[in-house]
Amino acid sequence: MRIIVPATSANIGPGFDSIGVALSKYLIIEVLEESTEWLVEHNLVNIPKDHTNLLIQTALHVKSDLAPHRLKMFSDIPLARGLGSSSSVIVAGIELANQLGNLALSQKEKLEIATRLEGHPDNVAPAIFGDLVISSIVKNDIKSLEVMFPDSSFIAFIPNYELKTSDSRNVLPQKLSYEDAVASSSVANVMVASLLKGDLVTAGWAIERDLFHERYRQPLVKEFEVIKQISTQNGAYATYLSGAGPTVMVLCSKEKEQAIVTELSKLCLGGQIQVLNIERKGVRVEKR
C-alpha cells in the first residue's frame, strides 16, 4: 500500500492562514510488513527513523494501538521552505492510521484532526482535498470550501536556506490597525471572487496587496524583490511568499511560463527554479 500526499502553497497573499492550493510535489509512504517496532526508512537529513518520526506520532495520536510496521518514506517536498512539508506528513500520518486501523474517516474528520495538530487549515486542507481550498477556523469551528483553481503555472524559487515557520511568525505584529484590517479583508474578498470567476489578472492584483503578513516577512527573503520585478516585467499575474517562506511563488499563464523561467535563471540566485502544476487530487491510497 502507498499513501501519496501533495505539496501545498498556502496563504497566497491575503489568504493568510486560510487559503492553500495543492501542487505537484509529493510525499509518498510505502507501507510494508508488520514489525516488532516502527521503522521509517528514508534518505532525509535529521529526520527520525523510529516511532518519534512525526508520521508515526501523528498516526498514534489518531489510534494509539496500531500494530508497528516497516515503512518507506520518499519526498521531493523540501523541508522548511513553505511548501507544506510538515503538513504533508501530518496528513499522511492520519491516513496511515485510517488505513491500518480501518477507521473509515471522512474527509471532514481528517481535516478536523489535521487542523488540531497543525493549528490552522491552510496547508492541511489542500493536502487532503487537492486543488484550491478556502478554509476558516473560529473557536474550533472549521469550515472549508474546495474549488477549482484556474489553469495556470506556479513557478517556485526554492532558496538553499530554510526559514522556520516559528521564525517567520515572530516578525508579525500582535495587532493590525482597524484601517489595515478592513483594507486587507476587502482585498482578500476580491482575490477569492476573482479566483472563483477565473479572473487571474484581478486575482493577481489582490494577491500582491496583502497587508496581513507579506510586508513583514518579505525582508526575510532577500531574493523576493528582484524576482517580483522580473516576473512582473514578463507578464506574471502575481509574486507572493509561499506559506511562511522562504519559497517565492510566481503565478503566471502557461504562455508566459518559459519566458519567466528563462529570465529568472539569468539572475543566478542561490536556489532552484521549478515549475509546478496544480494537483487536483489530495491524499490518496494505492493498494496493490
Curated annotation (Swiss-Prot):
It is an enzyme of class 2 (transferase). It catalyses: L-homoserine + ATP = O-phospho-L-homoserine + ADP + H(+). ATP binds at residues 78-88. PROSITE patterns: GHMP_KINASES_ATP. Pathway: Amino-acid biosynthesis; L-threonine biosynthesis; L-threonine from L-aspartate: step 4/5. The keyword 4Fe-4S does not apply. GO terms for molecular function: ATP binding; homoserine kinase activity. GO terms for cellular component: cytoplasm. Keywords: Amino-acid biosynthesis, ATP-binding, Cytoplasm, Kinase, Nucleotide-binding, Threonine biosynthesis, Transferase. It is found in: Cytoplasm. Gene3D superfamilies: 3.30.230.10, GHMP kinase, C-terminal domain. InterPro entries: GHMP_kinase_C_dom (IPR013750), GHMP_kinase_C_sf (IPR036554), GHMP_kinase_N_dom (IPR006204), GHMP_knse_ATP-bd_CS (IPR006203), Homoserine_kinase (IPR000870), Ribosomal_Su5_D2-typ_SF (IPR020568), Ribsml_uS5_D2-typ_fold_subgr (IPR014721). Transmembrane segments: none annotated. GO terms for biological process: threonine biosynthetic process. Its EC number is 2.7.1.39. Belongs to the GHMP kinase family. Homoserine kinase subfamily. HAMAP family: Homoser_kinase. PANTHER family: HOMOSERINE KINASE (PTHR20861:SF1), HOMOSERINE/4-DIPHOSPHOCYTIDYL-2-C-METHYL-D-ERYTHRITOL KINASE (PTHR20861). Catalyzes the ATP-dependent phosphorylation of L-homoserine to L-homoserine phosphate. This is Homoserine kinase. The gene is thrB.
